[in-house]
Amino acid sequence: MPVSYNRISLTDSIGYSEILDPKLKTNTLRIQFFHPLEKESAAKNALAFSLLTTSNAVYPSMEELAKKLDTLYGISLTSGVTKFGDFQTCGITVRTIADRYALHQEPLLQEMTDLLLTCLLQPNCVTDGFTEFEFQTKQKDLLDTIEAEINEKRAYATAQALETAFQNEPAALSCYGKKEDVLALTPQNTLAAYREVLHTAPAEIYFVGAESQPMLLEKLKAALTPIDRPNVPSYTFHVPSPAKAEPVTVVEPLPVNQAKMVLVLKSDCDNRYVMQMVSYILGALPSSKLFANVREKMSLCYYCSSSYSTPKQAMIISSGVEHDNLEKAKAAILEQLTAIQNGDISDAELESARMSIYNTLNGIGDTPGSHINWYQGCYYWNNYHTPEDSLKQYLAITKEDITKAARTLKLDTVYIMDTKKEEA
């Protein structure tokens, strides 16, 4: 039997999607809130959602919650924040085996739903703030996450490039906030931020399992309908970033052995399918021009690849380069783009891109999370369709379409993490 999908409005501002895949032996439930990415709230939201799945009012310590999870066949309970363009997504996910596979057919779906709702609606707090011990523990974890991003130089270089490329736009921010933002948090203002999300942010709930669960829908409706959410806005998630009049170059000397260079180019083409194809031809694959030519033939980069931000309409090209090769590498990278703009696309390159897209789309459904990610993407675009529908869109794209789209790309930002010279 094929996968079936159905979405209904649980309330005016909460959607409920049921994704049924007969091959699954697990049930997965996720709730996601969508909040504008803001300096004032990013760190608060990141910390708050990590606290929600650390303990709650019913299981008021990490140990007690862990024991509860162990009694339920090791239910997976996770939370986290991510970034999509100008928005921060904040979510909680629970997953366990389907009831019929439990040793005594225990009502695990009901238990995991109750657990998610308890975490969501009954956080562990005292005097209008999260409890101090859990707060300090998760605050340190968040600081460690931010520090790890800084220490991972490739990711850091990309983040710095985007900060310049999207200057004065929410997309310039990290979904975790900055270290100083995290250090300024208190149990009180973190709980207040969570309550603001709960009462004002649009939300989507996703259930993925083998069978329809009417009980689940009724339980969610009974728990969430009473929440006071009077004026929840609806958002447009596709917010293209305008290109700068002239490219901006930022050079940051750091004590690294290998320089990093990130180029950000912006487009006014709103066809995300064809722009993704441009990226596949340019640098998203081992068969792409950047890897085959700049890295392999010219030996100018240790790595060189591209990715495309659909909500911001921005192409991001990331490379690791020796200091002495920075200018050569930049010129060579832009030459590969020029080649595409001039129609230099081989049949093999086009077929490789199509095959990669086919494999990616064909893999949707291998995990419950891939189902959710697909339909959350549909939510962002307010366009619900299947992976098969998308494949048809991609396969219809011609070399001429790719060439025309590539010509819309304009260099916006060059970020260079340069090797710091030791002082004599």
Locate predicted features:
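Proteolytic maturation boundary segments
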Residues: 1-20, 212-251, 404-424
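Acidic/histidine-enriched alpha-helical segments
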Residues: 66, 122-146, 233-242, 335-364
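Active-site SXXK
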Residues: 45-53
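Non-catalytic, conformational "gating/processing" segments within enzyme and secreted inhibitor domains
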Residues: 129, 187-223
